[in-house]
Design a protein with these regions (language model features):
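N-proximal low-complexity "stem/linker" segments adjacent to membrane-targeting elements
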Residues: 1-23
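A conserved acidic beta->alpha catalytic loop
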Residues: 15, 23, 35-44, 58
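Glycine-rich, basic loop-to-helix element that forms the pyrophosphate-binding segment
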Residues: 55-73, 89
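Short aromatic/hydrophobic "clamp" motif used to bind/position activated sugar donors
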Residues: 78
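Conserved donor NDP-sugar-binding/catalytic core segment of glycosyltransferases
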Residues: 86-122
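Short, flexible, basic/aromatic active-site loop/helix in glycosyltransferases
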Residues: 125-165
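A short, conserved alpha-helix in the catalytic core of glycosyltransferases
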Residues: 158-161, 166-185, 189-218
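Non-catalytic, C-terminal membrane-associated alpha-helical segments of glycosyltransferases
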Residues: 233-242, 248, 253-302
Length: 302
């Protein structure tokens, strides 16, 4: 049996899972798929292929599904792999990086369909209050080259060299099982998705472990396949709710309130701008719910 296991979490992933699974199985790693109550034939396709499958009757969220996968397979090294990612190389460089002194895990290089590295996504710095404030207030979109955003998204980083990093993307991320156990797994409070992998990396570093980026390990990544399935309002609520949960866990209470205030202000700015562009009150209503969520957090302190 391989000492590497692969966990793939699916949610309405029938169109992508075939190519992902073919590459995962070809790697020789033990593979388990955890499906979060897909309705598009994903489960039927997985059963047809005879893959090891946990088919949830309800959506457990990404973190919950990953934790289920870890409980199912016992390999000492576990790769988290998105269903829209296709492994293009050996996984051995990732395993070797996991064996470096004090290493908790390693992420590989993600490339788009044209083979271009996904700079700004595959490795990031851990979010700071300043980074999230600028994000909430639209300043990163209006001035993407600002120093805070350049550091957060690692826009000046050399993707051709191995390096210690703060936050490899969870789409192609190998973790030592012992570290997952020590940290108690991913935080299932980040439901159904977003920021759970960021929080996990933050907790890894708080424990004094290191994380690495390994360019020799490569996967082609489409990205965002499940996001369009969410209605605009729920997409915004989930993303901002997870952002606020991360901020409450990792920032000083004063800085958490600053982030909350920025989200309130930014929600009104975004709502007005998008409603004007689309000539619809729907974005304003959606961002109004986000502002309400952040406002409650501002006054409750969590």
């Amino acid at each position: 049996m391989s000492d590497i296991g692969i966990i793939i979490v699916t949610y309405n992933s029938a169109a992508e899972i075939g190519a992902c699974l073919d590459a995962a199985m070809a790697s020789g790693a033990e593979t388990v798929v955890v499906d979060n109550a897909s309705k598009d034939g994903t489960v039927e396709e997985l059963r047809r292929r005879g893959v090891r499958l946990i088919a949830n009757s309800e959506n457990r969220g990404f973190a919950g599904a990953v934790n289920q996968g870890f409980e199912e397979i016992k390999n000492p090294y576990v790769l988290l792999l998105n269903p829209d990612a296709i492994i293009l190389s050996s996984l051995e460089p990732l395993r070797q990086a996991c064996d470096l002194p004090n290493s908790a895990g390693a992420g590989g290089q993600l490339v788009d369909a044209g083979g271009r590295p996904q700079i700004g996504f595959m490795v990031r710095g851990l979010p700071t209050p300043a980074a999230l404030v600028l994000e909430a207030l639209l300043l990163n979109r209006c001035w993407p080259g600002n120093p805070v955003n350049r550091r957060y998204r690692c826009l000046d980083w050399d993707s051709s060299s191995r390096s210690a990093v703060e936050q490899p993307a969870g789409a192609f991320f190998m973790v030592r099982r012992a570290v997952w156990q020590e940290l108690g797994g991913l935080d299932e409070g980040f439901f159904p998705l977003w920021f759970e992998d960021v929080d996990f990396c933050g907790r890894i570093r708080e424990r004094g472990f290191s994380l690495y980026y390994v360019p020799e390990a490569v996967a082609k990544h489409t990205g965002g396949h499940s996001i369009p399935q969410l209605a605009l309002e729920m997409r915004l609520i989930y993303w901002y709710r997870s952002l606020l949960r991360y901020s409450a866990k990792h920032f000083h209470p004063l800085m958490f309130r600053v982030v909350c205030l920025a989200v309130v202000m930014g929600s009104f700015l975004r709502g007005m701008a998008e409603s004007a562009v689309h000539r619809s009150f729907r974005p304003m209503a959606a961002y109004g719910r986000v502002a309400s969520l952040a406002g409650r957090s501002l006054f409750c302190g969590r």
